[in-house]
Amino acid sequence: MGEAIVTDVVIVGAGPAGLFAVFELGLLDIKSHLIDILAKPGGQCAELYPEKPIYDIPGYPRVNGQELVDNLLAQIEPFHPTFHFGEMVERLEVLGTPEAPSFRVHTSGGEIFESKVVIVAAGGGSFQPKKPPIEGIEAFERKSVFYAVRKMEDFRDKHVVIVGGGDSALDWTLNLHPIAKRITLVHRRDDFRAAPHSVNSMRELVAAGHMDLRLGQIVSLRGEAGELSAVVLKGSDGEAEIACERLVPFFGLTMKLGPIADWGLNLHENLIPVDTEKFETNVSGIFAIGDINTYPGKLKLILSGFHEGALAAQKVHRYVYPDKRLSFQYTTSSSSLQKKLGVN
């Protein structure tokens, strides 16, 4: 067994909820290490929709996923968190007691952590795209076939075919329309699950001749060396080729919770039940914040994860500093907090 990394808190997941938890913990002099299976911070915001606008973050009329992540990283910089990317938590050992919990965490990369608290901020777990059943599609992935839009510039002046009928398909149809050479939206029927205003906007573009809507299913691909030239659509009137340089199938995501499912956390439909006072699980010292948790009235919003992290930090302090009284302070008026943030 290698030498363990000793820290106050291990945070599983470096999405917005996990990042903001670092801030709230840092204000209380609590050190943290973050572990994430992705290669960079930001979770779904950075991995699935870095350039997609978000409209319900307080104080930001509009901010895209990557901008939000960048701002969170700047906000937590004074607390010098340590990140461990490309790793999954494989095993958790409970070492302490309910009154004085402690844990040993093992990762897929062979690292070992010992901490007093574990905060699970893993979103929905590890998300993997559902792939369309098209023979040979793997040969075009990462060059011409994408399951998420990470850089809009990759689609500029291209013939883009988007497949799907939900919010992601419609949102990216509308967002990419101004820069793509031509957008074709493909859905198996003329009935969409997306927000009505998005569907109406799409239909207006189709009626004006600015994009195409085709009904049917993509059955094969044309191209070579990973570069698409066309897709074959099978509809009610037979098969037809559609010019295509970028194919974006939005068939949804599958969620894999992974080893967290074996931690004895009384899972409910792959979510972790918590109390709403401190967002602690049934295991003392293990907290869950963000989309991974569930409780009556839960809203899966980024701002909910921020709120949950702030309240969780108060209880975490009791575990990390059991003999130290916590006095609540405001960053607007506390000189000690401002000193931690480097603003005075």
Curated annotation (Swiss-Prot):
Molecular function GO labels: ferredoxin-NADP+ reductase activity; flavin adenine dinucleotide binding; NADP binding
Instruction: Give me the comment on cofactor binding.
Output: Binds 1 FAD per subunit.
Note the SUPFAM superfamilies from the entry: FAD/NAD(P)-binding domain
Q: Which residues bind FAD?
A: D36, Q44, Y49, V89, F127, D291, T332
Q: Which reaction does it catalyse?
A: 2 reduced [2Fe-2S]-[ferredoxin] + NADP(+) + H(+) = 2 oxidized [2Fe-2S]-[ferredoxin] + NADPH
Co-factor(s): FAD
Keywords in alphabetical order? FAD, Flavoprotein, NADP, Oxidoreductase
- What does the record give as EC number? 1.18.1.2
What the entry lists under PANTHER family is as follows: THIOREDOXIN REDUCTASE 1-RELATED-RELATED (PTHR48105)
Question: What HAMAP family does its record include?
Answer: FENR2
Family statement drawn from the similarity comment of this UniProt entry: Belongs to the ferredoxin--NADP reductase type 2 family.
User: What quaternary arrangement does the UniProt entry report?
Assistant: Homodimer.
Protein name, per record: Ferredoxin--NADP reductase
Q: Which organism is it from?
A: Beijerinckia indica subsp. indica (strain ATCC 9039 / DSM 1715 / NCIMB 8712)
